[in-house]
Amino acid sequence: MLPRHSDPIVAIATAPGRGAVGIVRVSGKQIGALVQALCGRALKPREATYLPFRDAAGQAIDQGLALYFPAPHSYTGEDVLELQAHGGPVVLQLLLARCLEAAQGLLPRLRLAEPGEFTERAFLNDKIDLAQAEAIADLIDASTEAAARGASRSLSGDFSREIHTLRDALVHLRMLVEATLDFPEEEIDFLRKADASGQLSNLKRSLARVMQRASQGALLREGIKVVIAGQPNAGKSSLLNALAGAELAIVTPIAGTTRDKVQQTIQIEGVPLHVIDTAGLRESDDEVERIGIARAWDEIAGADAVLFLHDLTRWGSAQYQDDDAAIAHTLSNRLPAGVPVVDVWNKADAAPQAAAPAREGESQAVLLSARTGQGLDTLRRQLLQIAGWQSAAEGVYIARARHIEALRAVDAHLMEAAAQLESDGPALDLLAEELRLAQNALNTITGEFTSDDLLGVIFSSFCIGK
């Protein structure tokens, strides 16, 4: 353990601001003397004790609960003391200062914790693995109920157990191949007898299932960015308001009302969609409007999906069609390959006999009225399909981009391993190396093989006191 990880640490563990309860947390080795100094008595482990909190002069700071968790049966795996007082910021700062003051003659190395350091201690002391540690932050940051439930499953170890199952199968296959390397005269019969090819195929199928569930979990965590674009007065702000179920953007019949982006995160079946309303796209002499249009194109360039809004009531105008075609051409040039564009034909209520016109190259289209809500459910289903959401089935766990990247690396190494195994006269040393690299990639998910730099990035994103 690095030197800083042996220091006792203290921090306010509750969120900034006022609340009914606030917590000051201390973690370290052999903090019993500090517990005695702060509480005026020894505490019975894992039981709440109601008592006064006093400063060094014996003056009352507050009264509340103290809980002592001796190592190793604590959150961090070290001795942990929690002081639960009233949740005013001044009270908590006084308690924090009292902890540091009382430690001067007892725990002179006691210091303020860095962000995420309590959870980092839990990881380093084998209380949780890295995927579970990340799930704590994901649970705190969850923006939807589905994301919170998925993070809870990861925290309880569902994702980690899947990874361990894959790793165990991989280790068994590695043992088989590497043992064969020690007895080259028997290599072909030995591999066939043990059905190494069948084991590898089963492993690849299991990996595919984990990747599918992980990708769904990553979607719950990250969501997708959806940009609404189109000519002025096509109904972009009305569509944002309709999707959000609230009057977020100003709606007027005056073209060019929206000068800057308006963003709102909505959820459909628990999937967060970051929807952005943008300025109407057109040529303009107004400097402020031109800035808004430039920002609109910047947002479009970074979109995961674009809703290209058309006004059905103006589609009979040749000029309107030409302007729409010019926007479509610019979209095709500016958007990265593979970013879907949904043609949304708005104001269907004002043109009840109209059907969605067919545009050249159009692959997806929705006919709707942002004012009445007609067609909104169809658009929502279309957005879920674009996002890649398959169902709201139980069992999805939260995964991060780095987890997906690691699983893809495992898949690539297993593909190479399969190619070696299926070739005439397989190169067993190359096969063994691919399996080793696959295992290393798996281990980075749970933290069994992870660089200190990555740990620093992960835990620094936590709040102080967690």
Swiss-Prot record:
User: Which GO MF terms are attached to this record?
Assistant: GTP binding; GTPase activity; metal ion binding
Instruction: Enumerate the cofactors the protein uses.
Output: K(+)
Q: Report quaternary structure and partners.
A: Homodimer. Heterotetramer of two MnmE and two MnmG subunits.
PROSITE patterns in UniProt:
G_TRME
GO cellular component terms, alphabetically, are:
cytosol
Record bears the keyword Metal-binding? yes
Sites where the protein binds GTP: 233-238, 252-258, 277-280, 346-349, 369-371
Please state the gene responsible for encoding this protein: mnmE
Q: What residues does Mg(2+) bind to?
A: 237, 258
Q: Which family does it belong to?
A: Belongs to the TRAFAC class TrmE-Era-EngA-EngB-Septin-like GTPase superfamily. TrmE GTPase family.
Cofactor: how bound: Binds 1 potassium ion per subunit.
Q: Name one Pfam family in it.
A: MnmE_helical
* Protein name as it appears in the record: tRNA modification GTPase MnmE
Which NCBIfam families does this chain map to? mnmE_trmE_thdF (TIGR00450), PRK05291.1-3 (NF003661), small_GTP (TIGR00231)
**Domain TrmE-type G spans what residues?**
223-388
For the ligand ((6S)-5-formyl-5,6,7,8-tetrahydrofolate), the binding residues are 25, 82, 127, 466
User: Which function does this protein serve?
Assistant: Exhibits a very high intrinsic GTPase hydrolysis rate. Involved in the addition of a carboxymethylaminomethyl (cmnm) group at the wobble position (U34) of certain tRNAs, forming tRNA-cmnm(5)s(2)U34.
> Taking the first listed entry, what is the main subcellular location of this protein, grouped into a coarse class?
cytoplasm
Q: Which residues bind K(+)?
A: 233, 252, 254, 257
Give the EC number(s) under which this enzyme is classified: 3.6.-.-
Q: Which GO terms describe its biological process?
A: tRNA methylation; tRNA wobble uridine modification
Q: What class of enzyme is it?
A: hydrolase
* Subcellular location per the Swiss-Prot or TrEMBL entry: Cytoplasm
User: Which InterPro entries does this one have?
Assistant: G_TrmE (IPR031168), GTP-bd (IPR006073), GTP-bd_TrmE_N (IPR018948), GTPase_MnmE (IPR004520), MnmE_dom2 (IPR027368), MnmE_helical (IPR025867), P-loop_NTPase (IPR027417), Small_GTP-bd (IPR005225)
Provide this UniProt record's keywords sorted from A to Z: Cytoplasm, GTP-binding, Hydrolase, Magnesium, Metal-binding, Nucleotide-binding, Potassium, tRNA processing
